[in-house]
Amino acid sequence: MLLLGVVSCGEAMSGTPVTAVNTVTSGGGQAKSGEPDPSVPRVSNPKRLRGSDPCALLTQAQLTALGLPSANKAAQAQWGEAKCTWSGDIRATLSPDTKGRGLADYYARQKAFDNFKSSQVVGYPAVWADFAHTICSVMVGVADDQVLVVHVGSVSSRSKAQGNPCGYGETVAAEVLKNLPVGG
C-alpha cells in the first residue's frame, strides 16, 4: 500500500531529521515474535485521528496563520481514506492513514521513497519522505496504528514553505495535533 499525502504549515519551522536506519526485519516491519519492530518509534501519548474529517483538522485561525486559503478540496487518498487539499501560494494536503500499521508501514517501505529521514513533531515520531527544495511528505505517528500524512508543495516564491517544505509540513502537523482528542 503506497501512502502519500502532503500538508504544509505555519511560520515556525523546526525539526532536525536524522537518517533512518534500515533495520526492518524480514517480517515486513514486525519482529519475528509478533511484537512491533523495535526500530519503529512508538507513540507514547496517542491522539485519535480515526474518523476525523481532514478538512476540519485545522481551524480558520490556524489556516490564516499558516498562509493557507479557507477554501479546500476534499478527495480520496490512494489508500481509500478521505484527504483534504488547500491550494494557494502553498499546496497542502492532509491525509489520515488509520487503516494500516501506523509508521511501521512507512519504515517497511522506506526504500520505495526517493529519500527517507526520521524526525519528531512536538514529541510525536515522524518521517520525511520524497522531499526536495519545494516538496515534502511528512508522516506523523499520532498513535501506533494511525498516521497523519501531510504533503506540502511550495507553489510560489512568496510561500511560507519556500526552501523548507518539510519544516512547514511539521508546523502544519503540530497545529493539527493541537486539535486531535487524546486516545488511540
Feature map (PLM): residue ranges:
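Sequence contexts marking disulfide-bonded cysteines in secreted/extracellular proteins
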Residues: 8-10, 54-56, 83-85, 135-137, ...
